[in-house]
Amino acid sequence: MKFDVLCHINATGCKPSSLYTAVANQMLFSKPSKALIRCDVSLDAPYIMVEIEELAQLDRQTKCLLLLSQLLENLDIATLRKTSRISQIVFVLPQDELNNPVISDDTLSELLAEVISQQIPDFIQTTTLDLKSIAPDTLIIALDSCVSYQYVSHQAKNNVVQVLNGPPGIINGEGGCVLLTHLQGTLSAHLYNGELNEQLNQAEACVNDTYLFAGKESLAWQKKWFANTQALYSPEDELIELANLNNTIGHQGVANDPAGFVLANSYLNNPLNEGLQHVFLLFNSPNEQLIKISRSENS
């Protein structure tokens, strides 16, 4: 899959260089919530989240609408269509607790009509993105806000959420991004199959590679990662350090996978990393997935 990252919004701002600097230096934008969630049978504690300051105090739907409006404004679809073919638009957007879209298709049509004067391309709305079957010339617009008490308390029923002074868990955030898959894309993504250790073998991964983790943090995951990478080490090697996207900007919900591609772009297009040939992007939800991202030959 060849692609370009067109724009993004998260707690670090809108510039790839700011995102790279923040993640590479493990900068923290997180804060404890005012509300408490149940951690176990005997403990309530604030959860840790990363909120975009300008969106604080707003409800999830309003946040998502503002994020979408800003992405469309930054994108300039009308100009983009003059230089790039767009066969379809895929909106990766959240649903509410009743499994209804947070942003309706009618609203999406209205927003697109405001920014595109000519015929609007076909679009679909989904909550998941199948990275192995994305067609070329697809414009992917993904966003979510995952910091509300309602969202996190529901999430905590099936996941380990990071709470104040608690064990490793998911830090939630909010943001969005836009990708375009096309044959002239400046970045190329190669996905591997099988169990995590098999994927690492297929990729010929080594301890000196750059690994970007954009998944759900937990102690169980850390143990699994160490177990699967043991074979990569020789006695003198230092421990692999995962650049952790979600510890910096928070887990982006349904937009988390595309956000990982934004991070990879920020690493490969940073002047400080001119000699960096590729990075390995790593997801662990719903399954472990290793993706090698490199600069395209035609870029």
Predicted feature residues:
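Conserved "HGTGT" condensation-loop signature of ketosynthase/thiolase-family condensing enzymes
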Residues: 1-299
